Amino acid sequence: MRLPWVNGILAFLSSQVLQCLCVQELHVNAETANKISAAGRRMRCSSPLDILILLDGSNSIGRGSFERSKHFASKLCDALDIGSDLIRVGAMQYSGAPQVEFRLDSSFSKAAIKEKIKSIVFKGGPTETGLALKYIVWKGFPGGRPASVPKILIIVSDGKSQGNIKLPAAQIKGEDIEVFTVGVKFPRWEELHALSSEPQEAHVLFAEHVDDAVNGLATSLTNSSLCSSVPHGCSVQSFPCTRKTLETVKELTGNYMCWKGSARPGTVFPGHCPFYSWRRFYNKHQAQCHRTVCPDPCDSQPCKNGGTCIAEGQDKYHCVCPAGFGGDTECAPQLSLECNIDLLFLVDSSDTTSLEAFMQHKSFLKRFIQASLSDESPLNVGVAQYSNEVQMVVKIGEYQSMAELLKHIDNMRFMGGGLFTGKALRYVTQYGFKSTPVFSDVRDDLPRLVVLLTGSKSQDSVTGPATYARDQEVFLIGVTSDSNKGEMAEIVGNPLNLVTYSNPQQLFNQLPQLQKRICSIDVQGCQAQPLDLAFVLDASTAVGQEKFNRLKNFVTMVSLQFDINRDVTQIGLVTYSSRPETVFGLDTHDSGSSLLQGIGRASYMGGSASTGSALLRVYNDVMTVQKGARPGVNKAVVVITDGRGAEDAAVPAQKLRDNGIMVYVIGIGNIQRNSLLRLAGSEKFLISVPSYESLGHYEDSVVQRVCEDAKSPVNLCKPNPCMNDGVCILRQGSYRCDCRGWDGPHCETRILRGDSHWPQGLHSRSRQQRHSRKRRLKSVSGSRSSRKKP
């Protein structure tokens, strides 16, 4: 049997839960509800009106709900144009007896009235709504104006009056007072409807939804022609709404044994006593709620490509864009690919990758096309999927529009089966791109690129097919999971062409990286970016003649990617064993053909290796102004070695870096990593190549790294362009050399003996004077000789 005090606690807890339930529901979607609330914050009533707010301060309301009533009254003031000639506001509180809190003529300032509302103190007591209405009928609005000014009474109550309210309500309405009722807590809607003016559904509101209540009140005032508060472009709409009244009923739940008395004094006997429980339920009242709805800046759906529009006030918005978009405020493509290439996407559709991963790859592919391409894009796109076999979904360029291309991708079906990436690479290299007839006058020489999307390790070998693809001048970019990074790096060859992700969401975040890589895949060298570049080749016995020839071939292939001339790229070459040899300096060759001939003349040396001496040779004999180095141009040194003999190279390498010269180290084979890392300075500048045979796969990687770093700002005084211990001084985007005992722009001319103690400015003036005297002497002697002639 449940004890009475337990029932009391449960009833209290139940009431606290029920207070969280909504007792008024507008049957609208969340977007419309937000628009109603936003309109409520924008509406302003600006006609002459007398408004009296009647606050229920009884015990049935309680202190908490009374504070919410005050909050509603304060928010209502924000929608009113308060002034002595416009809207005047007063307030009364009632419980057992009515009490004037402040008169309508006490303040004409919105801030002052809100402060007065804030200072109202809860009274407590019985709920005598009828008595408060009679007071207003007898004495009118306290501080009100003549009858010509419309009067509005706003009753904020839970509608649980302890007296008769029908007669006072009729009397109030007979005084031409328009009555609004605003429910608080769990209102008794029947009583609020009886108190309010007609139409009742437009004059009954709910205080807990402040913006909605203000909207409804202002809308009704507009419909009654008492004021015009609907903002421009907004409209009044009617919505179905449900109002709920919380009822409590007493129900017999059983009997229990109890002792009952009898007519005879002192006599009791056992019997059955009834046990009751209280059940709470809602009575529903269907109604129509009239609200003002204003257009939203997001109504026109300005955010493209799946972006989410977030309104910021009446006219502004911002878009939350999916990855790969965000080129402007409306989620337009972030990067429009304008390069001319044949692009083939090769998508893993095997059981190894799973159906879920296949769908993610499809979504990624669609997102990429939407974000990067348009019908005017010069790229030719194709799509293939593979497992045991390869299926061409769309051949290169065989579609009329991006919409048609996306439709083909939508129609892709999961194949299942084994994962044979090597077989697929060989197939698309042979048959995936358009072939040009042998006797055609026009050669289709567009760069060819395959973007491989797979997250798993292949069941067949990928090394041979990947090498075959690169030999056929097919570029490879890999998009894969972190777990498959090793095999994909072997496929693409160049680490910069590898795009990895750790989870499906991060896959979409890699869109910008893929966009960036695609159009830079065919970039040759540094294009118009000036660069002074020196190669340092290990020609020691440890390398051998055959491998040294591979190094020369690597330098040749890399050099082909640069525009060799005095204004763009200059290249120098140093070979070394125990001693270094400058094969040619930066200013030796001014054309590509001449440079290639110079590389071919580099000879194998043999002997032990000293990388440090070679770097000192670069510093003292190659990267100098007298040997063609250009001030204000980025400078880089590429050292190719297996690490032997590099123990003495750390200090010279740091000397180069301290003078603004980048040092890249290509370590081949089973390298001595620690010594080469000290030589490179950081992981960024160390490129590990598994073997001499693999060097060819790293040509693009080296070029791209050097060219990317060559975009960095340059210090004109590093390395020092001043010869013969001159001091370089920066000045306004240029520099000058402060020379001691030398003259010329770079201190290249020795000053004549006897002039060394003169200031530098006098050297040039004295020489000018000597040259002037010589010219005058020549002129005089010439005139004399002419006079001697017959």
Curated annotation (Swiss-Prot):
Cell compartments where the protein resides: Secreted
SS bonds (residue pairs): C298-C309, C303-C319, C321-C331, C717-C728, C722-C737, C739-C747
Residue ranges occupied by any EGF-like domain in the UniProt entry: 295-332, 713-748
UniProt keyword Signal, yes or no: yes
Tagged with keyword Signal: yes
Biased composition (Basic residues): 764-778
Subunit structure: Forms monomers and multimers.
Designated name of the protein: von Willebrand factor A domain-containing protein 2
Domain VWFA: 50-221, 342-518, 532-702
Superkingdom, natural source: Eukaryota
Biological process annotations from GO: calcium-independent cell-matrix adhesion
Species assigned in the record: Xenopus laevis
Any one Gene Ontology cellular component term annotated for this protein: extracellular space
Annotated segments matching region Disordered: 758-790
CDD domains (alphabetical): EGF_CA, vWA_collagen
A Pfam match: VWA
GO molecular function: calcium ion binding
Keywords: Disulfide bond, EGF-like domain, Repeat, Secreted, Signal
Signal peptide: 1-22
